[in-house]
Amino acid sequence: RLMQGKIGSIVAIEPATGEILCMVSSPSYDPRLMVGRDRGKNHKMLSKDPRKPLLNRAISGQYPPGSTFKPTQALTFLQEGLITAGTQFPCHHGFRYGRFFQRCHGHASPISLIPALATSCNAYFSQGFFRMMSARRRYGNVQNAMTRWKDYMVSMGYGYALGTDLPGERR
């Protein structure tokens, strides 16, 4: 019922073992439509549905990681010595870089790491990423900084299939 009328997926995983406890994809369809004389017609109807009920979004959908990415960023910036737990960045309802603006919600400013994680401050982690990309003495150039950042992301499992036995799993 939680996903009724919504598009997306929910997966609950046991952190200690990686066991999948629950997996839901929405919208779904009545599996009885795929049996009987009308299954071909029903499949065609479902495949043309713009909401894509045949797509199992839990294993085949590709989504930006959103706020789940922030602890990963924090670990990267800490490991690289770019921030400490006490490092503060301003947040004026977001982060601006040229014409790009990453919005954030209202909270105290400036903000340090723990409150930034607790409030999911977009500006804090954008500032950290900007600091990493701008550290030319440390990395030489932006490309080297980006490669180093990507190495951290790969080491933490981002960008790759989980390797489950589920059909249709995508990177």
Predicted regions and their residues:
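Short loop/turn motifs at secondary-structure junctions and domain boundaries
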Residues: 2-6
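Beta-lactam-recognizing serine transpeptidase/beta-lactamase-like catalytic domain environment
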Residues: 8, 12-68, 72-171
